[in-house]
Amino acid sequence: MRTPIGLISSAASERVLADRRREQVPTPFGSVEILIGKIGGHDAAVLLRYGEKMTLPSHKINYRANIWALRELGVTRIISQNAIGSVNPAIRPGDIVISDDFLDKTRTRPNSLFDDSEAWVRVDMTNPFCPQTRAALIRAATARSNRVIERGVFVCTEGPRFETPAEIRALQMEGGDIVGTPLVPEVVFAREAEMCFASIAPVINFGAGMAPAVIHTGPGSMNDMYYTDGLHTLIEDIIIDTAKLLVDEARTCGCGRALRGGFHGTRPEWLKHCSLDEGA
Ligand SMILES: [Zn+2]
Protein backbone atom coordinates (compact mmCIF):
# COMPACT_ATOMS: atom_id res chain seq x y z
CA MET A 1 0.00 0.00 0.00
CA ARG A 2 1.25 3.45 -0.84
CA THR A 3 1.74 5.95 1.94
CA PRO A 4 -1.55 7.73 2.56
CA ILE A 5 -1.85 11.47 2.17
CA GLY A 6 -3.02 13.34 5.28
CA LEU A 7 -5.54 16.16 5.23
CA ILE A 8 -6.35 18.39 8.20
CA SER A 9 -9.51 20.40 7.67
CA SER A 10 -12.68 21.64 9.30
CA ALA A 11 -14.87 19.58 6.97
CA ALA A 12 -14.42 16.97 4.26
CA SER A 13 -17.23 16.34 1.77
CA GLU A 14 -17.85 13.00 0.08
CA ARG A 15 -16.35 14.57 -3.04
CA VAL A 16 -12.95 14.99 -1.48
CA LEU A 17 -12.94 11.87 0.71
CA ALA A 18 -14.60 8.81 -0.81
CA ASP A 19 -15.18 5.34 0.72
CA ARG A 20 -14.73 6.68 4.22
CA ARG A 21 -14.68 4.81 7.51
CA ARG A 22 -13.81 5.99 11.01
CA GLU A 23 -10.81 4.76 12.88
CA GLN A 24 -9.89 5.45 16.49
CA VAL A 25 -6.12 5.81 16.67
CA PRO A 26 -4.37 5.54 20.05
CA THR A 27 -1.35 7.81 20.59
CA PRO A 28 0.88 8.63 23.58
CA PHE A 29 -1.08 11.89 23.82
CA GLY A 30 -4.61 10.48 23.69
CA SER A 31 -6.88 8.75 21.22
CA VAL A 32 -7.97 10.47 17.99
CA GLU A 33 -10.76 9.76 15.52
CA ILE A 34 -9.51 9.80 11.94
CA LEU A 35 -11.50 9.35 8.73
CA ILE A 36 -9.84 6.84 6.42
CA GLY A 37 -10.76 6.78 2.74
CA LYS A 38 -9.64 7.81 -0.71
CA ILE A 39 -8.70 11.23 -2.06
CA GLY A 40 -8.49 11.20 -5.86
CA GLY A 41 -8.44 7.39 -5.74
CA HIS A 42 -5.50 7.25 -3.34
CA ASP A 43 -5.33 6.22 0.31
CA ALA A 44 -5.96 9.14 2.62
CA ALA A 45 -6.39 9.96 6.29
CA VAL A 46 -8.45 13.01 7.19
CA LEU A 47 -8.51 14.74 10.54
CA LEU A 48 -11.39 17.12 11.29
CA ARG A 49 -9.51 19.46 13.61
CA TYR A 50 -12.56 21.10 15.24
CA GLY A 51 -14.31 17.75 15.70
CA GLU A 52 -17.10 16.43 13.51
CA LYS A 53 -19.65 18.72 15.17
CA MET A 54 -17.28 21.71 15.39
CA THR A 55 -17.10 21.45 19.19
CA LEU A 56 -13.38 22.23 19.64
CA PRO A 57 -11.96 25.76 19.19
CA SER A 58 -8.34 26.09 18.11
CA HIS A 59 -6.97 26.67 21.60
CA LYS A 60 -8.51 23.41 22.88
CA ILE A 61 -7.34 21.07 20.11
CA ASN A 62 -5.10 18.15 21.10
CA TYR A 63 -2.47 19.00 18.49
CA ARG A 64 0.11 16.48 19.66
CA ALA A 65 -2.34 13.55 19.49
CA ASN A 66 -3.65 14.69 16.09
CA ILE A 67 -0.27 14.84 14.40
CA TRP A 68 0.92 11.61 16.00
CA ALA A 69 -2.27 9.77 14.99
CA LEU A 70 -1.63 10.66 11.34
CA ARG A 71 1.96 9.48 11.71
CA GLU A 72 0.84 6.18 13.25
CA LEU A 73 -1.30 5.62 10.15
CA GLY A 74 1.78 5.96 7.94
CA VAL A 75 1.07 9.50 6.70
CA THR A 76 4.24 11.32 5.68
CA ARG A 77 2.65 14.35 3.96
CA ILE A 78 -0.01 16.59 5.42
CA ILE A 79 -2.08 19.18 3.58
CA SER A 80 -3.68 21.68 5.91
CA GLN A 81 -6.84 23.45 4.73
CA ASN A 82 -7.16 26.86 6.40
CA ALA A 83 -9.97 29.28 5.53
CA ILE A 84 -8.48 32.55 6.76
CA GLY A 85 -8.66 36.34 6.92
CA SER A 86 -6.41 38.76 5.08
CA VAL A 87 -4.14 41.25 6.83
CA ASN A 88 -2.61 42.49 3.57
CA PRO A 89 -4.85 44.86 1.53
CA ALA A 90 -3.44 43.33 -1.69
CA ILE A 91 -4.72 39.87 -0.70
CA ARG A 92 -8.49 39.83 -1.13
CA PRO A 93 -11.35 37.47 -0.30
CA GLY A 94 -11.42 34.80 -3.00
CA ASP A 95 -7.62 34.60 -3.26
CA ILE A 96 -5.84 31.37 -2.37
CA VAL A 97 -2.59 31.63 -0.40
CA ILE A 98 0.10 28.94 -0.24
CA SER A 99 2.09 30.26 2.73
CA ASP A 100 5.86 30.04 2.86
CA ASP A 101 6.38 31.36 6.40
CA PHE A 102 4.50 31.98 9.63
CA LEU A 103 4.40 34.17 12.72
CA ASP A 104 3.39 32.47 15.96
CA LYS A 105 1.07 34.63 18.10
CA THR A 106 -0.39 31.78 20.12
CA ARG A 107 -0.07 31.80 23.91
CA THR A 108 -1.40 28.68 25.62
CA ARG A 109 -0.48 25.72 23.41
CA PRO A 110 2.15 23.02 23.90
CA ASN A 111 5.51 23.98 22.40
CA SER A 112 6.74 20.55 21.43
CA LEU A 113 5.82 16.89 21.01
CA PHE A 114 8.59 16.21 23.53
CA ASP A 115 7.31 18.47 26.33
CA ASP A 116 6.51 15.46 28.56
CA SER A 117 9.69 13.55 27.68
CA GLU A 118 13.25 13.71 28.89
CA ALA A 119 14.18 15.00 25.47
CA TRP A 120 13.94 18.10 23.38
CA VAL A 121 14.58 18.99 19.80
CA ARG A 122 15.56 22.19 18.02
CA VAL A 123 14.15 21.68 14.52
CA ASP A 124 15.25 23.96 11.69
CA MET A 125 12.58 26.41 10.50
CA THR A 126 14.38 27.98 7.55
CA ASN A 127 11.64 26.49 5.35
CA PRO A 128 8.77 26.21 7.82
CA PHE A 129 6.51 24.58 5.22
CA CYS A 130 7.58 21.58 3.12
CA PRO A 131 8.90 22.99 -0.19
CA GLN A 132 7.92 19.89 -2.17
CA THR A 133 4.34 19.80 -0.86
CA ARG A 134 4.04 23.57 -1.42
CA ALA A 135 5.23 23.13 -5.03
CA ALA A 136 2.59 20.46 -5.66
CA LEU A 137 -0.13 22.66 -4.14
CA ILE A 138 0.98 25.60 -6.29
CA ARG A 139 0.98 23.48 -9.46
CA ALA A 140 -2.47 22.10 -8.73
CA ALA A 141 -3.90 25.47 -7.67
CA THR A 142 -2.56 27.55 -10.56
CA ALA A 143 -3.95 24.99 -13.02
CA ARG A 144 -7.45 25.76 -11.73
CA SER A 145 -7.32 29.39 -10.58
CA ASN A 146 -5.68 32.68 -11.52
CA ARG A 147 -6.03 33.92 -7.94
CA VAL A 148 -3.25 31.89 -6.37
CA ILE A 149 -0.70 33.75 -4.23
CA GLU A 150 2.39 31.58 -4.10
CA ARG A 151 3.96 33.11 -0.98
CA GLY A 152 2.65 34.58 2.23
CA VAL A 153 3.24 34.95 5.94
CA PHE A 154 0.54 33.16 7.92
CA VAL A 155 -0.03 34.75 11.33
CA CYS A 156 -1.44 32.24 13.80
CA THR A 157 -3.35 33.88 16.66
CA GLU A 158 -4.76 32.29 19.80
CA GLY A 159 -8.46 32.92 19.15
CA PRO A 160 -11.20 32.01 19.44
CA ARG A 161 -12.15 35.67 19.03
CA PHE A 162 -11.18 37.63 15.94
CA GLU A 163 -8.40 40.22 16.17
CA THR A 164 -8.97 43.88 17.00
CA PRO A 165 -8.19 46.64 14.45
CA ALA A 166 -5.08 47.59 16.48
CA GLU A 167 -3.88 43.99 16.41
CA ILE A 168 -4.40 43.83 12.64
CA ARG A 169 -2.36 47.03 12.19
CA ALA A 170 0.40 45.57 14.37
CA LEU A 171 0.40 42.32 12.36
CA GLN A 172 0.67 44.34 9.13
CA MET A 173 3.73 46.13 10.49
CA GLU A 174 5.27 42.80 11.49
CA GLY A 175 4.97 41.49 7.94
CA GLY A 176 1.87 39.29 8.24
CA ASP A 177 -0.26 38.57 5.16
CA ILE A 178 -3.04 36.32 6.41
CA VAL A 179 -4.38 35.41 9.83
CA GLY A 180 -5.99 32.30 11.31
CA THR A 181 -6.01 30.27 14.52
CA PRO A 182 -5.11 26.56 14.08
CA LEU A 183 -1.86 26.48 12.04
CA VAL A 184 0.57 26.57 14.97
CA PRO A 185 1.52 24.15 16.46
CA GLU A 186 0.34 21.74 13.73
CA VAL A 187 3.14 22.86 11.43
CA VAL A 188 5.73 22.64 14.22
CA PHE A 189 4.70 19.17 15.41
CA ALA A 190 4.63 17.87 11.83
CA ARG A 191 8.26 18.97 11.50
CA GLU A 192 9.15 17.34 14.85
CA ALA A 193 7.43 14.17 13.60
CA GLU A 194 9.53 14.39 10.40
CA MET A 195 6.39 14.78 8.29
CA CYS A 196 5.88 17.13 5.35
CA PHE A 197 3.32 19.87 5.94
CA ALA A 198 1.92 22.67 3.77
CA SER A 199 -1.18 24.85 3.95
CA ILE A 200 -3.73 25.91 1.37
CA ALA A 201 -5.57 28.96 2.61
CA PRO A 202 -8.62 30.41 0.87
CA VAL A 203 -9.19 34.00 1.97
CA ILE A 204 -12.76 34.57 3.14
CA ASN A 205 -12.62 37.96 4.87
CA PHE A 206 -10.48 41.01 5.63
CA GLY A 207 -9.04 41.60 9.08
CA ALA A 208 -10.81 43.90 11.53
CA GLY A 209 -10.68 47.57 10.54
CA MET A 210 -9.89 46.79 6.89
CA ALA A 211 -13.56 46.34 5.91
CA PRO A 212 -16.99 46.46 7.57
CA ALA A 213 -17.41 44.01 10.45
CA VAL A 214 -17.39 40.32 9.60
CA ILE A 215 -20.79 38.80 8.78
CA HIS A 216 -20.95 35.09 9.59
CA THR A 217 -24.02 34.00 7.62
CA GLY A 218 -26.32 35.30 4.89
CA PRO A 219 -25.63 37.41 1.80
CA GLY A 220 -22.10 38.82 1.65
CA SER A 221 -21.00 36.70 4.62
CA MET A 222 -17.85 34.67 5.18
CA ASN A 223 -19.82 31.45 4.76
CA ASP A 224 -21.34 32.67 1.48
CA MET A 225 -17.88 33.54 0.27
CA TYR A 226 -16.60 30.08 1.05
CA TYR A 227 -19.47 27.69 0.38
CA THR A 228 -22.07 29.35 -1.86
CA ASP A 229 -19.66 31.00 -4.26
CA GLY A 230 -17.79 27.80 -5.07
CA LEU A 231 -14.49 28.54 -3.32
CA HIS A 232 -14.80 25.50 -1.05
CA THR A 233 -15.40 23.19 -4.03
CA LEU A 234 -12.42 24.71 -5.84
CA ILE A 235 -10.18 24.10 -2.82
CA GLU A 236 -11.32 20.48 -2.61
CA ASP A 237 -10.58 20.00 -6.32
CA ILE A 238 -7.09 21.43 -5.78
CA ILE A 239 -6.52 19.08 -2.83
CA ILE A 240 -7.60 16.09 -4.95
CA ASP A 241 -5.23 17.15 -7.74
CA THR A 242 -2.39 17.69 -5.26
CA ALA A 243 -2.86 14.21 -3.80
CA LYS A 244 -2.61 12.77 -7.32
CA LEU A 245 0.58 14.74 -7.99
CA LEU A 246 2.24 13.72 -4.74
CA VAL A 247 1.40 10.04 -4.69
CA ASP A 248 4.08 9.06 -7.20
CA GLU A 249 6.68 11.63 -6.14
CA ALA A 250 9.51 10.37 -3.93
CA ARG A 251 10.28 12.70 -1.03
CA THR A 252 13.16 14.95 -2.04
CA CYS A 253 12.69 17.52 0.75
CA GLY A 254 14.53 17.41 4.06
CA CYS A 255 11.43 17.02 6.27
CA GLY A 256 12.13 13.33 6.88
CA ARG A 257 15.46 14.15 8.52
CA ALA A 258 14.32 17.00 10.78
CA LEU A 259 15.44 15.36 14.04
CA ARG A 260 19.02 14.71 12.96
CA GLY A 261 21.47 16.99 14.70
CA GLY A 262 18.93 18.83 16.85
CA PHE A 263 17.84 16.04 19.17
CA HIS A 264 18.90 16.11 22.82
CA GLY A 265 18.21 13.84 25.77
CA THR A 266 16.64 10.39 25.97
CA ARG A 267 14.64 9.16 23.03
CA PRO A 268 11.08 8.39 24.15
CA GLU A 269 9.88 4.85 23.51
CA TRP A 270 7.03 6.07 21.27
CA LEU A 271 9.43 7.69 18.81
CA LYS A 272 9.86 4.85 16.33
CA HIS A 273 11.13 4.76 12.73
CA CYS A 274 12.74 8.16 12.49
CA SER A 275 15.97 9.56 11.06
CA LEU A 276 17.75 8.99 14.39
CA ASP A 277 17.89 5.31 13.32
CA GLU A 278 20.09 6.14 10.35
CA GLY A 279 23.88 5.95 10.57
CA ALA A 280 25.97 9.11 10.96
ZN1 LIG B 1 8.74 17.68 2.98
Task: Tell what function each PLM region has.
Residues 1-126, 279:
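Metabolite-binding pocket within alpha/beta catalytic cores that recognizes anionic/polar moieties
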Residues 71-74, 172, 191:
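Non-catalytic positions within long, well-ordered alpha-helices that form the structural scaffold/packing
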Residues 76-77, 177, 196:
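Short acidic/polar active-site loop segments enriched in Thr and Asp
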Residues 116-161:
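Histidine/lysine/aspartate-rich catalytic loop segments that bind and position anionic ligands
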Residues 143-177, 257-276:
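Active-site/ligand-binding-proximal alpha/beta "capping" segment
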Residues 181-219:
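Zn-dependent metallopeptidase/amidohydrolase metal-coordination segment
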Residues 208-259:
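His/Asp/Glu-rich mid-to-C-terminal helical/loop segments that flank catalytic regions of hydrolases
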